[in-house]
Amino acid sequence: MKRRALLKLSAVAAAALLSVSNFAFAQAREPIKVGILHSLSGTMAISETSLKDVALMTIDEINKSGGVLGRKLEPVVVDPASNWPLFAEKARGLLTQDKVAVTFGCWTSVSRKSVLPVYEELNGLLFYPVQYEGEEMSKNVFYTGAAPNQQAIPAVEYLMSKEGGGAKRFFLLGTDYVYPRTTNKILRAFLHSKGVKDSDIEEVYTPFGHADYQTIVANIKKFAQGGKTAVVSTINGDSNVPFYKELGNAGLKAKDVPVVAFSVGEEELRGIDTKPLVGHLAAWNYFMSIKNPVDDDFKKKWAAWVKSNNLPGGDKRVTNDPMEATYVGIMMWKQAVEKAGSTDVDKVRKAMYGQQFKAPSGFTLVMNNNHHLSKPVMIGEVRGDGQFNVVWKTPTVIRAKPWSPYIPGNEGKPDQVM
């Protein structure tokens, strides 16, 4: 009897062990859910749709090469529709209902600031792929776009140089929200440090979706009569289309009043006749026109993805800086997960520090413990075909300074996530 009972107990234990083992194996083979949080409608769709598309391309590339830790990635795409409170609602859903391991998303700083408390409360992980104003460092966000010292400051230094036209007066034009206002606060302080007076600086803001730039462009022409002038544009979204069209209509040439943009790239210019805009500038960390083997491969994969998925725009679709930053972010996250052996947010965070990736820009980008990438800086001139000629770039990558030295009170703030 004792022997029979012992055998029965052993069989039950073995079955239980097998059940647990099978459950663990099944769980290990379940796909890893990945959130994609971009506006696919509304004023920001012109810029953000391509970030969703390139994220899906990158996820597909990873899945075809075996996935991450032997598991496929499953994208969960949501559309916050350029509605800032809706971003927070969608982010909460991704974390609590869909149980995503990571989110790639947001463009505007107002959308990022809308979701930030959600990711910090629930200990989620967000990769943010767009240039921004700095003044932020969260353990729950990795910033793969540029900080002001990797875009705004070098661009204005270039405009002031002999090579860049020797500008003495600056018209700061932006969309009315935190990124343009904070960036221009930094730029005004920087210009003061270079001896530029307030009388030689003009600041103008328009709402999201603004479409009538006739009066503003007329005021730019009038302001430019006071001396060599440059326009610094932090306009975001589909308002860039009427602004650049009005520049062309008004005959405002780059040789007279150059415009440097921080949120306009190949995608935003795709639907515009750029011949009247030749010579105007954009500052980024990547341009589609650069040539190197990594970028050639990136563009080839993108063209194939567009064709195989019959994406709107077809062979006219382009690559741009935030797309590259999205691609780099996803690939770095994959490397960090594999290093950590887990998708656990705290483990992945630690594994992200020091991650390197050979980017389409031609540079090896490094993730620092301040959660920002070291990146190159490039300035490009608009061409007649909507692409950019790179006219200036840094020889090496530049470490991001999230806390600008031109903002009072930033002295002594830690340059790492605590």
Which positions does each model-derived feature cover?
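Extracellular/periplasmic Venus flytrap/periplasmic-binding protein
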Residues: 89, 133, 140-250, 291-293
